[in-house]
């Protein structure tokens, strides 16, 4: 018989830099999970993606064991890195804070495709383009 899931915890952590300090410690500690075991596994799995924030979904079972799934970095983070800016515009309708090319947009869309509710790269590009537009980043040919 399959183990029963008692909690699903969603966190966004720096790749390769998870430690028992908040937010990891309190979130996992209240469910009785071995925090250091999670930190070691997460850091090993994400060390090649250093510099990115990687969302993770942790399933905690009734025997206090756990499994986790890492997601792709948020689209906003990928867009700001591609555009070379610190953050998006507070008022996206008033002007552009940066540019990304169609090729960069396609690369981001291919990266995000597994986590998006899209079946093709073209539809994923439209989703990412909308995110970029809302951040005040323009798309150039």
From Swiss-Prot:
Keyword terms of this UniProt record: Methylation, Ribonucleoprotein, Ribosomal protein, RNA-binding, rRNA-binding
Superkingdom, taxonomy of origin: Bacteria
Post-translational modification: One or more lysine residues are methylated.
GO BP of this protein: translation
Family annotation (InterPro entries): Ribosomal_uL11, Ribosomal_uL11_bac-typ, Ribosomal_uL11_C, Ribosomal_uL11_C_sf, Ribosomal_uL11_CS, Ribosomal_uL11_N, Ribosomal_uL11_N_sf
Pfam families for this protein: Ribosomal_L11, Ribosomal_L11_N
One annotated GO molecular function: structural constituent of ribosome
Recorded GO CC terms: cytosolic large ribosomal subunit
Protein family: Belongs to the universal ribosomal protein uL11 family.
Annotated function: Forms part of the ribosomal stalk which helps the ribosome interact with GTP-bound translation factors.
Binding partners and assembly: Part of the ribosomal stalk of the 50S ribosomal subunit. Interacts with L10 and the large rRNA to form the base of the stalk. L10 forms an elongated spine to which L12 dimers bind in a sequential fashion forming a multimeric L10(L12)X complex.
Protein's name according to its UniProt entry: Large ribosomal subunit protein uL11
């Amino acid at each position: 018989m399959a183990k029963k899931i008692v909690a699903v915890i969603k966190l966004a952590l720096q790749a390769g830099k998870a430690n028992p300090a908040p937010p990891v410690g309190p979130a996992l500690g209240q469910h009785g999970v071995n925090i250091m075991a999670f930190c070691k596994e997460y850091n090993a799995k994400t060390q090649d993606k250093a510099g990115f924030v990687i969302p993770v979904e942790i399933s905690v079972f009734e025997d206090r064991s756990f499994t986790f799934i890492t997601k792709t970095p948020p689209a906003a983070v990928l867009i700001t890195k591609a555009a070379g800016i610190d953050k998006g515009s507070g008022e996206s309708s008033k002007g552009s804070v940066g540019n990304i090319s169609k090729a960069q947009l396609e690369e981001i869309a291919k990266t995000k495709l597994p986590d998006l509710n899209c079946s093709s790269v073209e539809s994923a590009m439209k989703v990412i383009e909308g995110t970029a537009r809302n951040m005040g980043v323009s798309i150039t040919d």
